Amino acid sequence: MIYHTLQYVLPWAEAGILDVDANNDVVKALGKDTFAPGALNMAKKGSKIAAVPVDGWTQMVVYRKDLFENADLAPPTSYANIVAAVEKLSKQNGMFGFVAATKTDENFMSQVLEHVLLANGVNIVKKGGIKKQGKKLKEALEFYKVIAKASPPGELYWKQSRALYFAGKTPMIIWSPFIMDELAGLRDSAPPTINSDPTSPELASKTGFITNFSGPSNKKGAAWADVRYFGITADADTDEAKQFIMYSMDEGYTSTLSIAPEGKFPVRRGNSSDPEAFTKAWSKLPVGVDRKAPLSDLYDPDVINNIVAGLDTANRWGVKEGELSRASKVIKSQFINRITRLYIDDQIDVDEAVDMINKSLAKFK
């Protein structure tokens, strides 16, 4: 049995390394409807689930709930809502409306862009090849330019976005959940600077998280997720492996998640007796480095539920098509980052950007 990342599920299933039937049996025994749909969909091989989802995390729009409420703004669940907030909150008290990733050679920009493009239904691959881009990509790039123009000048990545949010200089960033303990002043190497006390939970109490947001061409939206799986292999002692997974995903599931709660969201929310049992237990697990506190002490129940809900619509380019490898090569080449930056910097227009991306994509057929 192997604990592995999403990228190996379908290739290993196709190669016969995973015992798809055994893994599917475990999911059925635990209760398919107790798992986050997104985590299951990404592991689908035909009508079966090729590996058992264990845990995951989703990228998040991190935002100042207090500023949104004071300005009578809707939460940042869509391009339109984010643009409205940028327009209203930019320059307010010296604030930048957003801190978008603009450093083209940083994986952080690739990750943020994929999330933004997925939100509008953009997919760069299809089964057996590359997908030509059009209106959806154009809309996504236009949106990204708005948030980039509302950002400080320079080469921006995770470091600046976190620092500016912690200093109260921006109402919105996109980040991973590993920011959650830092927001609450539990990590001395990355303290909030919104007030004079670096251990204060004030910023955490004013922060909301959105994992799933949408563009105009994809009303249901999407969440960018990193999900991990248990895979029973073809040469495993099947009965022993099944028993281990059944225990780890039921009686022992809270212990499984406790290894790193802020990076291990429960993909299995509960069981037949309580559909939210594991979400509740997870929220009470201590997080932090220099100090510890449970997430439920730091964040309201609606915030916790928003975080976990992202796994319902979890997605990544190439997963459903069995083309994750091709999509990864495209992402690692970073040409989408570079062309997007040319557009942000007004060196090309949006139609030229779409055309250049299509020409570059064609090299990966």
Over which residues does each language-model region extend?
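Beta->alpha turn/N-cap motifs
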Residues: 3-8, 158, 175-180
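Extracytoplasmic "Venus flytrap"/periplasmic binding protein-like
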Residues: 1-35, 66-77, 170-172, 187-193, ...
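Glycine-centered hinge/linker elements that transmit conformational signals in sensory
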Residues: 86-88, 127-155, 198, 202-212
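C-terminal lobe and pocket-closing loops
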Residues: 183-184, 200-201, 216-334
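Short helix-loop capping/hinge motifs at secondary-structure junctions, enriched
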Residues: 66-76, 92, 123, 150, ...
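Short helix-initiation/N-cap motifs at beta->coil->alpha
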Residues: 79-83, 154-167
